[in-house]
């Protein structure tokens, strides 16, 4: 018609040419639409219903082939039935979209990845070939599968992708094959067509994403295994144009998490069971069962053998497995077999690898981790947990432990509770069960609380985590915990029945134990924990022993701390605490701890201070032992002198000095014996030595404080204080209070004392010492106790200095030089008598710590020697006693020579001496026949107005003394009063009480005592 129309019309008319052109365009458009429709019909025909065949895999076009992502492979045997189960479906995390074209190069910088997981579950009528391995009693194979089908699967994945990762495991008890695969699509693949194919057959990938522009793409199966998609806008293809360009969604669509079970016929399987445990994700929230329409494939691979594309490496390994995980590391569990009590079914891992590339960064988000943790919590809330599901959860937690710490921190406490709940709700029939994964190991033991024996849990080989319940633990353990047999002795009666199982956990990575409050401390070990049926176990009579290897070797000169994870710290977020734990032994690669409770344990390295080098430690050790030895000798001489010569120990200060010297002597002797006793490593003996060392240290501190208290009475109270049985009460306080403190510590737990290592000598020998093991006990009963005494003594020391300054103002100019020397001697004597040198310990840190440690070691270990110098050798009355009874010849002093001289010249030379003597730091009286060690009035025959040896040192005060029955009273105006007393007033029990009634120095006798 068109042609004939042309006969009757002028050929060159423009209207006709335009009409012809339009008609031609319409025809071309119809042809394009027709071709597109035919292609869509072809794809639909592939998915037409059929009861005799099933979909098991997808075949995309290879590079350079037209779009065939919707074509399906394999016509399957009609007689064999199987179930294809999509165990888990994750929310699709897609890629940035382009609106013009749909190939991968426009969407991603490299490739798109799809991850899927399927379970082949055979029906009862399916013949399963089982090969019994008589050597080890395990099943060497579950399914007898042909190499042809394996080749078909390999070819399918190779055609679909540049590289892929697949791992399958067999479970004998369930007669299933579980496979997880990850495919890296070719760059020329049509993404939308691939998505349409997945949606049509109702199978979604577990994950769907592309490489992040900031990170390189995986290029090997190992990297594909660790791939986690970065959350981006998902791919959204137009509904009416499934092959058209994808659209970018502003928000991620919510894809329901479901388990889709499809009953189809299949004769496809793997040639061999695969040696890798696959982790089946947690219990799904929705289960859907449907019959898939069977497609009519255009390329039936089952009809002819297919040749595998060349691959570069195949990794095959075998290990007894039944747990499911899509990680490369082996996972162990125990699932009973129908024919054997606890079979261990070997599996085989097949890895098709390509040239290795760069590592992919974990790109999960908090919402992803939150969803996975919530799923596990929901499954645990249902009650009893079967071993296979427990193994899956352990593997899931193990995988989450490698998430970025910043993302994992908000969920750390919940994950710890999930791990505890797994062991608490685990249902098993045997006595013990253990579940291991690459980063987490869990073991549960059934126990009888009334008959509990010592139990040990150990973990081995961090690269292939294994557990052991042998006692003692294996030598190659990276972490072990030993529970004493007395663990449950103190449980309440209603808790004994509940204590039916003990759970052990081992964390290969400390991701769940991040403490932001740590400043100069860092975790250097693995983490191990133990619990008894989710009960609180503390204040044990015998401590738990924990041995942990260091992740990296630590130098011997660094300080470590044994700590446990306290859930209540940092506002409920958890944190490390050392309460109840102490270091028992430290080596370069391992630390052994003892703790009085059960929880999660670890080792912290103290970076705040660096310990001294071994050579410095050796020098300080020698100084300490030499100083203690010298002090012991001279303290003994001081004690013998004051005990042997009755005339120099009649006053109260001398008696107080005797008690202090006795305490210091016993302290030094026990300290010298301590290291030698520690070599025998006898627990009871070592505890006894530590107890006595603690006791005599507190006694020494207490008597130093009593010296200061006596000075307070002499200076402040003066005449107005009288204390009956003065020394007896001092003895009760000085020896009794330390005994009460030590008794309380022993009552709480004898294990607060024990052997500990305090460094090493240059030859590597450990410096073991019997001392306090608990930091809490040490800081309260030693540091706190000493701080109180030290503050009292420093205050008293300042008061004495003030008094010396007042006295010096009243001195005549000619005598100042002499009194200045006496003042210095008095100050030095008080410094050692009151233990002021112990204050060097407060400065033994920072850049000057070495200097002050040497000062501390020298002055404190020689405290006994300095007491001998200032309170024996420097005292004139003591030297006279030595000359009278110990010397001979010209050095010997006549027994009554000093008494006659004093009687003749005493009245002529009496002057008020307001200086402080070098031996007693007190005012000297000219009536000093024996020159005793009173603190402020230095007179052997001094009458103490209050019965305590007190005398006034004020401007109008009065000092007095007794000489051979005569009492000499001196006021500061130089007047002298004499009276007779028939009783010996030099015995410290004067019957005269005096009271100052005016500032002029007048005295009144108020009563006789």
UniProtKB/Swiss-Prot annotation:
Phenotype when changing residue 763 to A: Strongly decreased G protein-coupled receptor activity in response to dehydroepiandrosterone
A single GO BP: cell surface receptor signaling pathway
Annotated site residue numbers, Cleavage: 598-599
Region named Disordered: 279-305, 325-346
Biased composition (Polar residues): 280-293
Post-translational modification: Proteolytically cleaved into 2 subunits, an extracellular subunit and a seven-transmembrane subunit.
SMART domains: GPS
Domain GAIN-B as annotated: residue spans: 453-611
Outcome when changing residue 853 to A: Strongly decreased G protein-coupled receptor activity in response to dehydroepiandrosterone. Impaired structural change induced by deoxycorticosterone
GO cellular component: apical plasma membrane; cytosol
Primary location recorded for the protein, binned into one broad class: membrane
Disulfide feature: 562-593, 581-595, 686-770
SUPFAM superfamilies, alphabetized: Family A G protein-coupled receptor-like (SSF81321)
Full protein name: Adhesion G-protein coupled receptor G2
Organism: Mus musculus (Mouse)
Gene assigned in the entry: Adgrg2
